[in-house]
Amino acid sequence: MKNNLINMDEINKLIKPIVEELNYELYYIEYVREQNENYLRIYIDSSKGINLEDCEKVSRKVSDILDEKDPISDSYYLEVSSPGIERVLYTEEHLHKYTNNQIIVKLAKLFEGSREHQGNLISFNDDTVTIEKENESINIPRERIKKIILKGEF
């Protein structure tokens, strides 16, 4: 995946070994521009959960390698955090991991009368994401999906 300013594959190759060496999962990396500032956001996860100290530890190590290799020419803020309880499902791996869990599917356009559908993630393929909603299967075209969020259990 290529960003206008940076090569995300290169960033991933630098960061992933560090995160894994510290016994965390690299959940996702994004480089975004918000309010005229650039942010490199690194989401980490662990079966034990993530706390502030975990984020600080990863941030220090990642910051060192990014300063050394300097893969981003523009100035940016580095943020390390947990993906949260109601996390966005970005990848096929995420969808696979959370199959049979409650999700919220946010859509760009109306589909079956709504821009948001909530249900149990049953399956997915290249074309559709299938959820079970009120004992009915709904096949949602992937090209209409803006975001899929894991529904947190409170």
Swiss-Prot record:
Pfam families: DUF150_C, RimP_N
Keyword Cytoplasm carried by entry: yes
Localization annotation: Cytoplasm
GO cellular component: cytosol
Keywords: Cytoplasm, Ribosome biogenesis
GO biological process: ribosomal small subunit assembly; translation
NCBIfam families xrefs: PRK00092.3-1
UniProt record similarity statement: Belongs to the RimP family.
Protein name: Ribosome maturation factor RimP
Domain of life: Bacteria
SUPFAM superfamilies the record matches: YhbC-like, C-terminal domain, YhbC-like, N-terminal domain
Originating organism: Clostridium novyi (strain NT)
InterPro entries assigned to the protein according to its UniProt record, in alphabetical order: Ribosome_maturation_RimP, RimP_C, RimP_C_sf, RimP_N, RimP_N_sf
Main function: Required for maturation of 30S ribosomal subunits.
Record flagged with keyword Nucleotidyltransferase: no
